């Protein structure tokens, strides 16, 4: 497992060879669990991250049978209307876009439910308005609490064009609860990702050209069929393994089925720009295998917008810089000094304690590569970025380094 690999690399290793998966992305995992719950039949959802456990418990409370074996969940679907009412308010706060799908699901039930949206109110309001046009009654009780369910929905033609993707999935699922046909208007042919989630589960979603745009229609009353899903890995969790493989001669690592999304790949691109041999194999649907070979990283200066895009990976970049040919300067990270502790100062002191050649200045650090790091004891202060960076130190340092087990768990709970 990924946890086990992270523990192993705390001791020096000569090379990293093999294939691995990293924990799946939270939102796609939760979406797959909800769609499995409202399907007819049994689904297996694999590579589910620990953080999706709250969603699993919520679905169980609504009467869905879910068994777990390692990171794979077996879900006994209850169909569109087979969920069980609960007496207590259902808390959707903090669930992000998955709250949208649950809101639709609950609105379509025969029973009345109370939901607490908390900080999700503003995000959900757009979908609440759209569901209202289908006839779903969603009444506001307080600023962030709503009552819904028990209403009869009817298909309609939406005037809105190019409804946001996550709203669109909510509306299309809502259309399954409605009587008649629901029609959406779109301007582009490639806005069909959410449609594929339903088509893959046996739902007929018609898309036809009309004038300069497209009409997407869904008939109510269709059955959603079970579908097994393997959740793609979270790119950020692959970086420690990639970094370790880059710096150890003889390594040959493949990270399987990683999701690479626009706007989230800046650190991957930076590594390749400074000489990292990382081949990206496109598997389709935004999923990729990453093939990693040992590489000599080159000098670079990271500043301004470039820094902003990789700010979450500064610690790992600094660790990898100790193995580079030349000097890597990381500027414009003074904001990291303002949190619960001086992140930059702590990173500098930690690397210096390992005999790394590192310098500190008010807005950043500079690291000179080519000098072996000595073993030491590291405190990641519960920060996920430091945990993963210091785990890589454990592989690269002469003699290994100590990092607490509880600290090691935190990247998988964020």
Model-derived segments and spans:
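Short, structured segments at the rim of ligand-binding sites
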Residues: 2-414
